[in-house]
Design a protein with these regions (language model features):
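NAD(P)-dependent Rossmann-like dehydrogenase/reductase catalytic/cofactor-binding core
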Residues: 57, 62-109
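C-terminal substrate-binding/catalytic lobe of Rossmann-fold NAD(P)-dependent oxidoreductases
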Residues: 1-71
Length: 109
């Protein structure tokens, strides 16, 4: 893929938590977010999975030894970037379905 953003962010946990506990929070927070996909355990996001889409794939791993969480995300910066976000926001403002015009975007390059 000749485009895309793959991000890895690190955070220190204030207390020890399990993958399942944190996953419940992710699922609860993103359950109504049409374009956010929380991946299965041990599946890192890849830009090829979001190419040409408005989706953002996220996942995380916890290092219990250091009490750190590593959060990963992937998005197509040409669709989910400013243009796709503008269409998504316009849809919400105008009372249209959030995904209107964003499910079958053109693929170039």
């Amino acid at each position: 893929m000749n485009r895309g953003i793959l991000v890895t962010a690190y955070a220190k946990l204030k207390k020890q938590v399990s993958y399942e506990d944190l996953r419940k929070l992710y699922d609860k927070y993103y359950q109504n977010e049409y374009f956010v996909r929380v991946l299965n355990k041990d599946v890192p996001p890849e830009t090829r999975w979001v190419e040409g889409s408005n989706y953002v794939d996220v996942n995380f791993v916890i290092d219990p030894r250091t009490k750190r969480v590593v959060v990963m995300g992937a998005m197509d910066n040409l669709v989910k970037g400013a243009a796709g976000q503008a269409v998504q926001n316009m849809n919400l403002i105008m009372g249209l379905p959030e995904e209107e015009g964003l499910l079958m975007p053109p693929m170039f390059p």
